[in-house]
């Protein structure tokens, strides 16, 4: 028997249920989805993360799970390096899509996302990152910044 096909909603800094493009995308698909949050052990050790920040995230996830329980859904809270966690999930499921918001943060989160993108490409997983805050990752200069800003503003 084959693995269960699933989509994954990867919650990063966008801890909410209202007006959430990743949840909306997962709901519009005809396969089950697994909402996850990863306390990435490679990221939380950096000095820009505090116990207060981690407590806020934990309590926000508890609140989301209270709301999702009426839909028989729950955010699975995971701890470890993100790539290792996605490899483990791939051993359990046939991952079709990963839906998340594009994160803008520290260099380490950018490097993590590059590793996850390579993993997705190697395993034929579609990773759809929704634009959240008008930041365009990976650009080398600000040429066409005004044009890009207007496009994002009116999407």
Name the predicted role of every residue range.
Residues 1-155:
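Active-site "lid/cap" and pocket-lining segments within catalytic core domains
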